[in-house]
Amino acid sequence: MRHTLPHAPQFYVTAPQPCPYLHGRAERKLFTALAGDSANELNNALSRQGFRRSQNVLYRPSCESCVACMSARIRVSEFEPSRTQRRIARRNAHLRRLATSAWATEEQYELFRAYLDERHADGGMADMDIFEFAAMIEETPVRTRVIEYRAHQGDSSEIPPPPDSDQLVAVCLTDVLDDGLSLVYSFYDPALEGFSLGTHIILDHIDLARSAGLPFVYLGYWVPGSRKMDYKAKFSALEIYKGGVWQPIGDPAQHTSDIHPLSIDPIVEQVARINLPSNRR
């Protein structure tokens, strides 16, 4: 009788590229494929260790001379909205949330293009066509939802929906983990910047996680010194994954992107410390 043993994930490293967050620095990522029956379990385990999902790949920054990127998550039970965040929630309370399967639509792509053209015209995703967008949404081997936010005609709101229809104003691609919700990618109507829809998406996911009994909302990476990431530090009960452990962020100003050369471990040691699901060892 022949038995097939489970294969442990293989980890690889990308070639250095210009960092999108800190000028003059190089970015390098440690990554592994995400596939098969154990994909959800692997996604759960590695998300707790600072990894993020992009389609069928899990990755974590592993730069040669920088450890500035730190995974961030909100402790749902301890979160208290600020006065500004409460005002944002009230202003967007009329929006209808719709959770759908991971299926891309032309309407979503049009909103995505408007968002990129206005907010990230020089970014790495700026040239994505509709087929690449569909791959970003649909190529997922794990439990994923597309969360849409819509304003309806007749709503008592300042967001005017188009005649005879409702208006798609924001979208979030969300993974459902065993301990929380992970915001993979979100975008919104750039013409409605005054409504702080990015913040509203996070606040709504905190409510979603609380109602589902999930303890965390994963926000991706926080980078001290990066203005693009400043908004994440404005949420209370925020934890960062630093030095191999989750810890309260404390005063964001105390964190720096400057490091000692000996504080970065070789790739082999980093991989050896990754805790894999028990059936994948």
UniProtKB/Swiss-Prot annotation:
GO terms for molecular function: arginyl-tRNA--protein transferase activity; leucyl-tRNA--protein transferase activity. Belongs to the R-transferase family. Bpt subfamily. This is Aspartate/glutamate leucyltransferase. Its EC number is 2.3.2.29. The lineage of its organism: Bacteria, Pseudomonadati, Pseudomonadota, Alphaproteobacteria, Rhodobacterales. It catalyses: N-terminal L-glutamyl-[protein] + L-leucyl-tRNA(Leu) = N-terminal L-leucyl-L-glutamyl-[protein] + tRNA(Leu) + H(+); N-terminal L-aspartyl-[protein] + L-leucyl-tRNA(Leu) = N-terminal L-leucyl-L-aspartyl-[protein] + tRNA(Leu) + H(+). GO terms for biological process: ubiquitin-dependent protein catabolic process via the N-end rule pathway. Keywords: Acyltransferase, Cytoplasm, Transferase. It is an enzyme of class 2 (transferase). One of its GO terms (cellular component) is cytoplasm. It comes from the Bacteria. It is found in: Cytoplasm. Pfam families: ATE_C (PF04377), ATE_N (PF04376). Signal peptide: none annotated. Functions in the N-end rule pathway of protein degradation where it conjugates Leu from its aminoacyl-tRNA to the N-termini of proteins containing an N-terminal aspartate or glutamate.
